[in-house]
């Protein structure tokens, strides 16, 4: 008779601590091993919500992670199955994302990029030596072991990883993150370990200049760029990158997977193994600046898509990355959006894609290929322009409120359209048109005898409505001192519509809520001095 199984219940071996983050069917918590006091990150999966296919993915992820023991890979220490929950106990990595750390550094050079990609290639090479293809290499899965200077880079999230025999290639399904997908995956051809090298090439390109080699807001055009291998090295940012670095990128971003460099070969490339002699050590401030924008963009895209997409694939959405200062959880985000697997793609009888669960779409055959680097930079420029216009709207709104506070009717009329419309408490629910209604308050309440007041705009939200119109919504807090020296504050919620005429912004409509009086009267009813 077999010996009884050892006690493996999670709570018997670990103390659960605070939550680090959560995914669709899982939650990540810090835990402490009772016997040693060591800290780990426990990925806790609610198995009641899983399908049979999800169970297979979970078992595959655990099986693969158990095979991998390398200083540059987030290690799985324990896998515990209970009645309704499965626990995966990983390294607790506390250094955050590699890309976020780079932008916080005082110095960053080509040699630093070489050291980063070397560690990534070491992890990939270990995977490939053990018959594992990661399939989802991207910045979000590159973490740092700790906050210490020179901390090791750790490859995380094996939710999409597969097992292969040797150099065998087959169609293992459509999986990965759009901006990092290889041509063979997009062409739905047999593939293998070389898909990871392609993704490493994309990552190295970003490490050197701060933006990706393939990029387009339209996913159709993005996929066409990738399948054609349409990338370049635009001036001036690439002029200062050594030829050896470009040579390695070219060998990684080779469209033919059979001619693509392997991880072992890449580690022997002069730019990697002889970096002290080959790689430049000049600080790359423009790369850092561009990488900050790249990081912000992918985080924003990820946040938006996380709210839009509820895919069935749980395992690629929740592992270990940053959450606060000392702990990590992983949510899939990227400038090219969400991690995808073929299970997520539902086609109807006509072959069109069900967009209710995924952003993947069919690729048209004839699409004009644009220079991705220039397109990316142009879009960043457009984003900066939009940001500048939002600041314009906030500033002109502040100027209008200042005119009200100071009783400057002339200044008020210059900012407002003559046919300004408004819903406001003073009009008792009626729509007021023109500024004569407001003139009464300027002449009788907001005149020269009005005490100094202070107004604060809270949480301004600006919606740009084309090039010449915008709407701003905000909370307005007004403070003033009455003639007895008592402080008063009241709050109102306001929305203003602005229109640009003759290159000047004018307020054409506003809506103000009734004041929430902490004390005091209405927005226009300020108590004059003696």
Curated annotation (Swiss-Prot):
Tissue: Expressed at a high level in the central nervous system during the late embryonic stage. In adults, expression is more abundant in the head than in the body.
Reactions accelerated catalytically: L-seryl-[protein] + ATP = O-phospho-L-seryl-[protein] + ADP + H(+); L-threonyl-[protein] + ATP = O-phospho-L-threonyl-[protein] + ADP + H(+)
Regulation: CASK plays a role in regulation of CaMKII autophosphorylation. When complexed with CASK and in the presence Ca[2+]/CaM, autophosphorylation of Thr-287 causes constitutive activation of the kinase. In the absence of Ca[2+]/CaM, autophosphorylation of Thr-306 causes inactivation of the kinase.
Modified residues (Phosphothreonine): 287, 306-307
Residue numbers spanned by region Disordered: 320-358
Outcome recorded upon mutating residue 306 to S: Fails to interact with CASK, catalytically active and can autophosphorylate
Catalytic residues (UniProt): 136 (proton acceptor)
CDD domains: STKc_CaMKII
TM regions (residue ranges): none
BP GO annotations: cellular response to starvation; chemical synaptic transmission; courtship behavior; learning or memory; long-term memory; male courtship behavior; negative regulation of apoptotic signaling pathway; negative regulation of cytokine production
Region named Calmodulin-binding: 291-301
Keyword list, A-Z: ATP-binding, Calmodulin-binding, Kinase, Nucleotide-binding, Phosphoprotein, Serine/threonine-protein kinase, Transferase
SUPFAM superfamilies named in the record: NTF2-like, Protein kinase-like (PK-like)
Record domain Protein kinase: where: 12-272
Modified residues (Phosphoserine): 327
Top enzyme category: transferase
Post-translational modification: Autophosphorylation at Thr-287 is independent of autophosphorylation at Thr-306 and Thr-307.
Pfam family name, one: Pkinase
Protein family: Belongs to the protein kinase superfamily. CAMK Ser/Thr protein kinase family. CaMK subfamily.
PANTHER family: SERINE/THREONINE-PROTEIN KINASE (PTHR24347)
Subunit field text: Interacts with CASK.
Name recorded for this polypeptide: Calcium/calmodulin-dependent protein kinase type II alpha chain
Species of provenance: Drosophila melanogaster (Fruit fly)
